[in-house]
Amino acid sequence: YSAVMLGYSSVDEFADTNSLLVDAEQLFPKGSIELANLKLLSAISIEDCILMAASLSCQSGSVLRSTFYKMLRGKTELLYPVESYIYEDGLGLSGWIENKRVLLGTRELMENHSIDGLPSEAKEKEYTNGNVAVYLSISGITAAMFVIQVSPNLSVTRWLQELELEGITTVIRTVDGFLSQRFLSDLFDIESDSVKLLSFRYHKDYESETEYVPRQASSMLC
């Protein structure tokens, strides 16, 4: 992404900018997020676990979407239709697929829904080995743990740090519970108060503000 300021009027218009809206997917270009391990935690097949998690991720716009796309080798026709979903702020996704309640997110999400079959925190630490645990539950049972390796992109890190220096807050739309302010500040080496996470109730407002329009004011071309 790039931008061009067209004249002094553009400088006047944007001089007081104090925040920037961005989708979390833009912070993690291809190769930033990889599947490090997959731990089955129930009798549910690995294929069903992958398809359920991939379906919910792809429908919601999760940063894990490209990771699952890679696992499916681009065969999106295999995905299940998602009947509905919501993002529980700071926790993860809750949706309905094939008349089954499917949760995808943090350990806290599972605990909040009293999901059975979670491994102990000691076991989780052993399985993840410093990476991120994303849990999948199907119909009230912990089905699998996806161990995710997240690496900061150098150019993204640089512009987030530059925005911080300019006093501009990056407001992030995400549906991934593990992307907390603390996680992002540690990952990109910025202060935690330089990023804010957009609550799910404002996601439709975000979409209306950032949707494509055929015409735009000439003060800035992006």
Positions of PLM-derived features:
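A generic structural motif
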Residues: 35, 108, 149-150
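Conserved ATP-binding TGD loop and adjacent catalytic N/P-domain core of P-type ATPases
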Residues: 5, 97-99, 141-222
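Juxtamembrane coupling segments of multi-pass membrane pumps/enzymes
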Residues: 1-11, 69, 77-78, 199-205
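Short, small/polar residue-rich loop motifs at catalytic or cofactor-binding pockets
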Residues: 14-17, 89, 128-130
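Cytosolic beta-strand hydrophobic patch enriched in CBS
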Residues: 21, 93, 132-138, 172-173
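A glycine-centered beta-loop-beta connector
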Residues: 25-26, 96-101, 136-141
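Conserved catalytic phosphorylation-site environment of P-type ATPases
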Residues: 1-54
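ATP-binding catalytic core of ATPases
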Residues: 39-90, 111-114, 120-124, 175, ...
